């Protein structure tokens, strides 16, 4: 299960109420509003705790999301582009976050750079539909994945800090 800091961070993210995906145009607007409010609250909380680690934005329809995430290791910032699409069956199905530049560098990743969240995150998501949203995906999915995988990839020499490449 999650550590105490993660539990605290997640407990401060507003739960969502609208059970709607992109196919339901009217309710989807309401769901998106809730998603943005939860994401804003999560980012504000992270900044207040000096734990700011991602930026995220979407297309106009809220169906394609993209941004940057980063991980600090030994005082060096490793930054990655990330992207995901909202599944048509959302929120019953969690989005699959991709970090394309890490594709093929870890076994905990699917083709196209989609991170593997099957064992730990997806059952938790399924138990919390429709209350969980994109902020929860970041807090309980991508964040822990980065914390485990990035130090391992650095130790194996599979990724290097951008300043070490010059």
UniProtKB/Swiss-Prot annotation:
Q: Name one GO biological process term.
A: protein ufmylation
A GO term, aspect molecular function: UFM1 transferase activity
Query: Which residues are named in the active-site annotation?
Result: 116 (glycyl thioester intermediate)
Does the entry feature the keyword Transferase, yes or no? no
Organism superkingdom: Eukaryota
Task: Give UniProt keywords alphabetically.
Answer: Ubl conjugation pathway
Supply the Pfam families for this chain. UFC1 (PF08694)
Looking at the keywords, is Electron transport present? no
Q: Which residues form the signal peptide?
A: none
**Function according to Swiss-Prot or TrEMBL:** E2-like enzyme which specifically catalyzes the second step in ufmylation. Accepts the ubiquitin-like modifier UFM1 from the E1 enzyme UBA5 and forms an intermediate with UFM1 via a thioester linkage. Ufmylation is involved in various processes, such as ribosome recycling, response to DNA damage, interferon response or reticulophagy (also called ER-phagy).
- Which family, according to UniProt? Belongs to the ubiquitin-conjugating enzyme family. UFC1 subfamily.
Known partners and oligomeric status: Interacts with UBA5 (via C-terminus). Interacts with UFL1. Interacts with UFM1.
Protein name, as recorded: Ubiquitin-fold modifier-conjugating enzyme 1
Organism (species) = Danio rerio
